[in-house]
Amino acid sequence: MKISRICLGAMQFGNTAPWMVELEDARKIWKKAWDLGINCIDTANVYSRGRSEEIVGELVKGMREDVVIATKVFGQMGNGPNDRGLSRKHVMRQI
């Protein structure tokens, strides 16, 4: 599979800030990106406390073989010692 030169950033997908968009608007953004040849989405566990990743999952349903998802798992998701970083426990919890 070839990855598009441009990747769609999904930090704006979610609901924790006034500038973010939920699923309906995210679908419009993704459709436009897809129509322009973009097949890569970048997200992270800390984007809207995981909501961005949930939205991305909804967006790529049925087309998973054609899309590249880049995500990050380092971010702090809680107050415990294993709620951030790259420990095996944290990484496995995030995926």
Residue ranges and their predicted role:
Residues 1-68:
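N-terminal binding-site loop/beta-alpha segment at the start of enzyme catalytic domains
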Residues 12-24, 77-92:
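Active-site mouth loops of central-metabolism enzymes
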Residues 29, 90-95:
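Short, well-ordered amphipathic alpha-helical segments that serve as non-catalytic structural scaffolds
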Residues 66-78:
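A short, structured active-site edge motif that brings together acidic residues
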